Amino acid sequence: MYNAPSAQEMSYSDHVQRRHEEKGCLYACVFTALCCFCCYETCECCLDCLCCCCS
């Protein structure tokens, strides 16, 4: 699949941004929503992504 970053860890926001760039906004929003659904909380990144899709 994807190689892990070698020198630094990718943050959650960076990961969502990468998905947005590679697959588009809708895919990034679904990815973010499913991630928050799995951890049972809404994070700031989820809200930013949803606002991005609604704009």
From Swiss-Prot:
<keyword id="KW-0472">Membrane</keyword>
<protein>
    <recommendedName>
        <fullName>Protein CADMIUM TOLERANCE 1</fullName>
    </recommendedName>
</protein>
<keyword id="KW-0134">Cell wall</keyword>
<dbReference type="InterPro" id="IPR028144">
    <property type="entry name" value="CYSTM_dom"/>
</dbReference>
<keyword id="KW-1133">Transmembrane helix</keyword>
<keyword id="KW-1003">Cell membrane</keyword>
<dbReference type="InterPro" id="IPR051671">
    <property type="entry name" value="CYSTM1_HM_Tolerance"/>
</dbReference>
<comment type="function">
    <text>Confers resistance to heavy metal ions (e.g. cadmium (CdCl(2)) and copper (CuCl(2))) by chelating them at the plasma membrane of root cells, thus stopping their entry and reducing their accumulation.</text>
</comment>
<dbReference type="Pfam" id="PF12734">
    <property type="entry name" value="CYSTM"/>
</dbReference>
<dbReference type="GO" id="GO:0046872">
    <property type="term" value="F:metal ion binding"/>
</dbReference>
<keyword id="KW-0964">Secreted</keyword>
<dbReference type="GO" id="GO:1990748">
    <property type="term" value="P:cellular detoxification"/>
</dbReference>
<keyword id="KW-0479">Metal-binding</keyword>
<keyword id="KW-0812">Transmembrane</keyword>
<dbReference type="GO" id="GO:0010273">
    <property type="term" value="P:detoxification of copper ion"/>
</dbReference>
<dbReference type="GO" id="GO:0009505">
    <property type="term" value="C:plant-type cell wall"/>
</dbReference>
<dbReference type="GO" id="GO:0005576">
    <property type="term" value="C:extracellular region"/>
</dbReference>
<feature type="transmembrane region" description="Helical">
    <location>
        <begin position="24"/>
        <end position="40"/>
    </location>
</feature>
<dbReference type="GO" id="GO:0140487">
    <property type="term" value="F:metal ion sequestering activity"/>
</dbReference>
<keyword id="KW-0346">Stress response</keyword>
<comment type="similarity">
    <text>Belongs to the CYSTM1 family.</text>
</comment>
<dbReference type="GO" id="GO:0005886">
    <property type="term" value="C:plasma membrane"/>
</dbReference>
<dbReference type="GO" id="GO:0071585">
    <property type="term" value="P:detoxification of cadmium ion"/>
</dbReference>
